[in-house]
């Protein structure tokens, strides 16, 4: 091989190596530039995402801040309302203490007047005794002067005559005192009763059997009725109350003899109107909420009544029953208002006679507690009240005050007599009671009681002013055939046990629901 060829080969190798180096360097630089560009894009994207995340975090923090502020403001409002309520209670308690202070002051003044009167009478008696002694001395001197009597004989004669004169005067004074005491006692008794009535004055409103619910517009009537009347039937079935929808503008009338049911229907209907969604499922939900809300309202009524009367440490169940009295009527009187009035009158009478005022008020408030219970048996409200007060460990004085309302049970304490007296005072004042309404409600209650006595009946409602009884039965115990027989049996029982005008329609309702959930 020649030298030039070797040199050319070496040169070619060197050129190839140098060219490959620079070619590789160029490719590496291009890759490096591409990597830098990609890194810059990633960095920019990361910055962008970081800015977005920062903004979202700031927005979320602001929302949390607003939400927390709203919760704090709501809690502050609730606390302010609670503080205001406590302040109102303290004000009421101060007013009660002021009234008691005035009563004690009047009683003290009365005792002072009696003391002054007794002191004057005592001075009068001492004066008359001195006059009698002076008369005896004068007679003794006269007898000794004109008669030949010894001193002992004269003394006996004078004493005998003085005794006769004093006995006559004493009898006259006793008769005058008895007559004065009789007149004073009668006047004091009248003043005491009038004072008790005035100091315990309570507004009495005769309950009716209807409640009016105001509508925002007349278009709401059609929504309440629903397609083919489904909504109104559902509401009537769940509450046992008649809904009367007529030409009265923007109003629906709820008719039923039970004020508790009417109140449930009213609350549920008002919630449905406010919500705007009226259909059977929503109606069931609102009726359940209304019942729960009414239970809370009943408890608050009982607590307010016991607080106003200064009665403490009463069993919570008894407090709820006291609240339920607001939805019971007796001879046209609101039972809670009547019981509060009786409690106040009993307290006033007990204070005048020196009895335990708090115990007297307690007995007066609970004297009709049996009317608040759901009567599932044939016991009278007096027997039921005795059982309830014994169950919740009330004083024997309270139990006897309830029992003494029955003629066959004697009052065993002064407080029991005072409760009976206060009950009569509250019941017999003009305009306090209405017997016709009481008898009407008793007939409706009897209709439901007859229906509920049959096996398989879940509950029943007397509606249409007693012209219809709707009986809801348990579908697992009453078949369609049994429902026909049950309606006939209830009809015959009503015909045998009740006197009523016109006809009574018996409607037996059997409803079967099958529910499955698709997952």
From Swiss-Prot:
Biased composition, class Basic and acidic residues, residue ranges: 92-120
Gene Ontology MF terms in the entry: RNA binding; RNA endonuclease activity
Residue ranges constituting the HD domain according to the UniProt record: 335-428
Annotated segments matching region Disordered: 92-124
CDD domains from the UniProt entry: HDc, KH-I_RNaseY
Regions that span the bilayer: 3-23
Keyword Transmembrane: yes
The keyword rRNA processing is assigned to this record: no
Gene Ontology CC: plasma membrane
Membrane topology annotation: Single-pass membrane protein
Compartments reported by the entry: Cell membrane
UniProt entry keywords in alphabetical sequence: Cell membrane, Endonuclease, Hydrolase, Membrane, Nuclease, RNA-binding, Transmembrane, Transmembrane helix
E.C. no: 3.1.-.-
Domain KH residues, every copy: 209-272
Family to which the UniProt record says this protein belongs: Belongs to the RNase Y family.
PANTHER family given in the database record: RIBONUCLEASE Y
Record's function text: Endoribonuclease that initiates mRNA decay.
Listed NCBIfam families: HDIG, RNase_Y
Protein name: Ribonuclease Y 1
Organism (species): Levilactobacillus brevis (strain ATCC 367 / BCRC 12310 / CIP 105137 / JCM 1170 / LMG 11437 / NCIMB 947 / NCTC 947)
